[in-house]
């Protein structure tokens, strides 16, 4: 386990899956991340690679050959190597093996860097294609936050906040296969760029927002501008997300 710490936050990262395992807010004496209680969900913030979500019937076809891969890929369940550790950052590396090629045939390197600056935590991914052909992949984050965040509040007191939009369009999952249902879309109405976390909101699993609708999202009580927010962004050459703890 690796620790990044300053006077604001204490962040822990595991070699297993290079998974962010804790964000302790010293100012407010609270743990931001979910505790990975296996009776509900056994993870904190897994990386999703080389696929986000599931393939149809857990199979994909690459260069005429069928490969089997589970939900969200294999990286989250593998041991990474810590290749660099500084006062405020930790970089992990996962490389292709004979075992990974059974699920995904490419030679690759996946670097994950966690950087702590003040109350900002940045997670950056760098994917290196070691093959001579096009390598098809997706990469993503799956952090789970402790809600309610503050004492004497309940989950329904919190709002999901977005960057000032009036509404968003989303798709649902086909729970039989874990894939999106693109033929039907739904509207999420927003007031002042936010919506309340309602009972049953995720009864049908995840809400899928495509077409780059969301550039910034957060979790907040109505009286706060933001409490925790994740800003997905595309950097050259690596994608990343940033969490701001307020």
Where does each model-flagged region fall?
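Buried hydrophobic-core signal for structured, non-transmembrane domains
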Residues: 13, 64, 123-127
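Residues that act as N-cap/strand-start positions at coil-to-secondary-structure junctions
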Residues: 5-7, 17, 54, 74-76, ...
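Intrinsic-disorder/low-complexity, polar/charged segments enriched in Ser/Thr/Lys/Arg/Asp/Glu/Gln
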Residues: 1, 8-10, 87-91, 109-111, ...
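Extended, loop-rich substrate-binding clefts of extracytoplasmic carbohydrate-active enzymes
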Residues: 66-118
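Beta-strand-rich N-terminal accessory domains
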Residues: 1-59, 66, 212-226
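Active-site/ligand-binding surface loops and adjacent short beta/alpha elements
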Residues: 136, 147-233
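Acidic, contiguous internal or C-terminal segments within carbohydrate-active enzymes
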Residues: 96-143, 150
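A C-terminal functional module that forms or caps the active site or interfaces directly
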Residues: 226-246
